[in-house]
UniProtKB/Swiss-Prot annotation:
This is tRNA (guanine-N(7)-)-methyltransferase. The keyword Isomerase does not apply. It comes from the Bacteria. PANTHER family: 3-DEOXY-D-MANNO-OCTULOSONIC-ACID TRANSFERASE/TRNA GUANINE-N 7 - -METHYLTRANSFERASE, TRNA (GUANINE-N(7)-)-METHYLTRANSFERASE. Pfam families: Methyltransf_4 (PF02390). Pathway: tRNA modification; N(7)-methylguanine-tRNA biosynthesis.
Length: 215
C-alpha cells in the first residue's frame, strides 16, 4: 500500500460561515456499507479519521461514520480507507450542527448505538461560543436517533469544554451520565485518539464522560 501525502489544512474552521450552512444529503446506507444493518458508531469531528480507522479494524461487526467539516481531511481519509479495503467505514464532509437530522433520519431504527465527540475545537472566546460543536440542538438530534441504551462518549483536554459538553447532555432528559465521579479515569473504548495519547504522554489531564440514552 502506498503512503498518502500529508494534507495540510486550517486548524480551525468557522461552522457558521456561509459555505458550511448547507446540510448534507442523506446517505444511501446500502451503498456505503457492505453490511448496513450492523450497529453504527458515529464520530463527530473525526479530523484525519485515524481513531475510527483503527476502531473499524478492531470491531469489524460495527459500522463507523466519521463526520468532519474540513473537506481535504475527508478526501484523504476515504482514500486511506479504500487502500485498506474497509467496508465498514466511511467519512463524510459536512457540518454536524446542521447535518445530523437529514443524515440520521434515513437510518433504520435502532442502528445508531454509539457516538463519540473527542477534543472538539474549544473556541476560547466567549463571543465564539456558538461555534462549538456541542450545542443543545445537536444534543437533541442525537437523542432523537440514538438507540435506547446507546452511549455518547465525550472527552477533551480543556476542562471548560468538557464541562460545557457534559452540562448540555445532562440538561437533556433523554440522557443519564454513567458513573458516580465527575470524570472517567479511563477511556472505555479500545482505541485512543492521537490527541489523547499526546496529552497523556505530557502528563496532562484528559476530561472524559459517558452518557447513556435512557428514554
Amino acid at each position: 500500500m502506498s503512503a498518502l501525502p500529508f494534507v495540510r489544512v486550517r486548524q480551525h474552521v468557522n461552522p457558521l460561515a456561509q459555505k458550511y450552512l448547507t446540510p448534507a444529503n442523506p446517505l444511501e446506507w446500502e451503498k456505503v456499507y457492505s453490511s448496513p444493518h450492523q450497529p453504527l458508531h458515529l464520530d463527530i469531528g473525526c479530523a484525519r479519521g485515524r481513531f475510527v480507522l483503527q476502531m473499524a479494524q478492531v470491531e469489524p461487526r460495527w459500522n463507523f461514520l466519521g463526520l468532519e467539516i474540513r473537506e481535504p481531511l475527508v478526501i484523504e481519509a476515504n482514500q486511506f480507507r479504500s487502500q485498506l479495503g474497509l467496508s465498514n467505514l466511511h467519512y463524510l464532509y459536512c457540518n454536524a450542527n446542521n447535518s445530523l437530522q437529514p443524515l440520521l433520519s434515513s437510518l433504520p431504527t435502532g442502528i445508531l448505538q454509539r457516538v463519540t465527540i473527542q477534543f472538539p475545537d474549544p473556541w476560547f472566546k466567549t463571543r465564539h461560543a456558538k461555534r462549538r460543536v456541542v450545542q443543545p440542538e445537536l444534543v437533541q438530534d442525537i437523542a432523537n436517533y440514538l438507540a435506547v441504551g446507546g452511549v455518547v462518549f465525550l472527552q477533551s483536554d480543556m476542562e471548560f469544554v468538557a464541562v460545557e459538553m457534559c452540562d448540555r447532555f445532562a440538561a437533556n432528559p433523554a440522557f443519564k451520565k454513567v458513573g458516580s465521579g465527575e470524570w472517567l479515569s479511563e477511556n472505555p473504548l479500545p482505541v485512543a485518539t492521537e490527541r489523547e495519547t499526546t496529552t497523556q504522554n505530557r502528563g496532562e489531564p484528559v476530561y472524559r464522560a459517558l452518557f447513556e440514552r435512557i428514554s
